[in-house]
Amino acid sequence: MENFGRENFAKVHFFDFAATPDLATIFEGTKNPDEILPKLEIVAGSKIDRKKDVLVLDEIQDCGDALNSLKYFYEKCPELAVMAAGSLLGVNLKKKKGGRIEPPKTYPVGKVEIVDVEPVSFSEFLHEKDNVLWEYYMSIRGNDPLPDIFHRRLWDFYSIYLTVGGMPEVVASHLSEGDPARVRKLQQDLVQLYENDIVKYNGEIDAAKILVVLRSVVPQLAKENSKFMYGALREGARGRGYEEAIEWLVSARMVRRVRNLDAIEYPLSAHDVRNAFKLYLNDIGMLKVVAGIADESLVLDRDFPFKGRFVENYVLQQLAGKAFGAVHYWAERSDREIDFVIQYGDNAVPVEVKSGGDKRASSFKGYVNSKKPKFAIRFSERNLKKDGAFVNIPLYLVPRFAECLQ
């Protein structure tokens, strides 16, 4: 936000509620910007130009009064640009009332533009690594095979991305230092930070159950049938005791939930199977360290048993940043499953994810041949091409799958 502010405004006025908890007292008892801004100016030691500057409120989850004041900044001081950010806002904006979970009454609905920040995508990563190659990447349309030289170069960057993932601090370290050991240490620290955040909220939440669910994601994915099983958490575990823990992790954007479908039909949301789902981690860099995957296994494209699920997590992460609705999967029996199903326009699109180490039997080809959907996608290490009834799209082009279908 500071970088964005410096590039687009005359001056950035940055306030961090976590670093300076006393800032919260400025927002107590008033929501009036004309009373709040002079006090912030004293703290900052500089005048805030309401027409030229930007006000940045970081870690706003630590100050509910500041969050609620955003409505009044919008109404009473519309000429001032205000940006706010916080971790775990998805859960901190919710509170229990009468057994229900609802947003606070004073939450500025309709007054604030909410942006969910996804991890850095492969496309964004490539832009920072090789801007010239990125421009070529962004020009790709249709499904004609790419020249081998570009295919190999893009695959090399994809392999590096798998080791780094998309967490901004980790990506920034990789770009500035290029030290794999430092990258791994930051990823390990983030995993620990996730767990520390969960423990911090113990009492308001059942931290023990949330940690059990979070730590079960990798072993549950590693099963031949990766559907989430409550019984795998601990002996006698039932859904009723852990549903809230899963909802907390999803709202906190620590895990991604992919629901099963009872039919591959548009609209997908009408065919959710609510009690059948898989859980993935939010970022593949964190999945790498939690699963204990060595960087060289990814860079050298080695086969290993968990690789198929790891690459699925990568694909999901790239798809989740696209604005076309939730990603699903389809499984009718243990031997009939399609990795993902996405909604593209008014089409339900089956998706197969293939990695070099993935030897699972697939129902994808049988479904495509029998149902003949308008679009069908296979993400793999092979070059871009129309392959019979489906389009083969290389894994590095997942963020641009829509352009490849044109």
Regions found by a protein language model. Give the residues of each.
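Structural recognition of the conserved hydrophobic beta-strand(s) that form the central parallel beta-sheet
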Residues: 81-87, 116
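Conserved P-loop NTPase "ATPase switch" module shared by AAA+ and STAND
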Residues: 48-66
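Interdomain motor-coupling "hinge/lid" segment immediately C-terminal to the ATP-binding subdomain
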Residues: 93-222
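Short glycine-rich substrate-engagement loop in P-loop NTPases that contacts/grips substrate
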Residues: 19-51
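Active-site beta-strand-loop-beta-strand hairpin of nuclease catalytic cores
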Residues: 342-350
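Accessory nucleic acid-recognition modules appended to NTPase machines
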Residues: 171-342
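P-loop NTPase Walker A phosphate-binding motif
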Residues: 1-11
